Structures are given as C-alpha cells and as structure tokens.
Design a protein with these regions (language model features):
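Acidic, surface-exposed loops and disordered segments
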Residues: 1-160
Length: 160
C-alpha cells in the first residue's frame, strides 16, 4: 500500500458510525490520544500516525493471521455470535501461550483479501486476527485503554 492511506478506504460495513456521539466520541478520542502518546506519537504527527496504523496490515509482525468472514445475509444477532467466537478463539490461543490481536481495520481491505483468498461472494470480510508471540515490552502492548465504570453502562438487579 505504498503511498495510499488505508484509513480512507471504506469497509463494506461501518466500523464506526459516521457521526459518533457522546460519551463514545470522547472515549474514542481519549483512547487514541493515550495510545499514540504511549508510542511517543504526537497528535500533529500525521506521518507517524499513518505509519503506526499501517502496521495493522503487517499484522504487527505476527507470523500467523486469520481472516474472519460472515455470511452477508446474517444480522446483528449472528454478528454478536461471531464476536463471541472470536473472543473464545483468542482466549484459547492465550491458553497455548499465544498472543492475539483482533483487527477490524482489515475490513477496509475486503476487495484485496477477497481476491487473495478467493472468498465466495456471499461472504463478507469482518476482520483479521493476528496470532503470534507478542512483544510485551512494546509500549502499545503495555497500554490499557481507559474503562468506564460499570455503573455508566449497566444496571445490576438482584445482587445484594
């Protein structure tokens, strides 16, 4: 992808809503500021930010990657099931000493990937999952995104 900014390629589905609203907009922005800050990349350093984003398409140097697709006719419930499957796969890999990274950014590369893997037309690329041995000393791997308090997004009933 030399000379091409993959952030401007549309995925087949919206990875994020076109107009993010609060509190999600602020949370997403804060996550970006903190992650790129941990990497020593300033907000105004567009070239370094793009270079870091492009590392997605090298699977962050992982030796193995999976492309995950979903049948185009399936709806939100099945997409939730797919997320659960991916999550389980990632936990299982961890049990074998492997690290993983789910990469929805690959959804933007659906044409390239579809052609490369000869994906049937009824399938839609959802994401990739990089699998390997993480560099735990890398600042991105020590970074933890801020978390909202559970009381901000859920209610518990029937618990003491």
């Amino acid at each position: 992808m030399p000379g091409r900014d993959p952030r401007h390629i549309e995925a087949e589905y919206p990875i994020y809503p076109r107009k993010m609203w609060e509190p999600y907009k602020s949370r997403r922005e804060e996550h970006g500021v903190q992650l790129y800050g941990a990497l020593g990349i300033g907000r105004s350093d567009a070239q370094a930010r793009l270079a870091q984003y492009k590392r997605n398409f090298e699977f962050f140097n992982a030796p193995v990657a999976l492309f995950v697709a979903v049948d185009r006719k399936l709806g939100p419930g099945q997409w939730a099931d797919l997320g659960g499957y991916i999550h389980t796969l990632m936990y299982l890999a961890r049990g074998y000493g492997l690290d993983t990274c789910a990469q929805e950014s690959w959804g933007r590369m659906y044409r390239l990937v579809g052609e490369f893997v000869n994906m049937p037309p009824e399938q839609m690329l959802f994401c990739a999952v990089a699998i390997g041995y993480g560099d735990h000393a890398h600042p991105a791997n020590g970074f933890r995104s801020p978390r909202a308090e559970p009381s901000e997004f859920c209610k518990f009933f029937g618990f003491g």
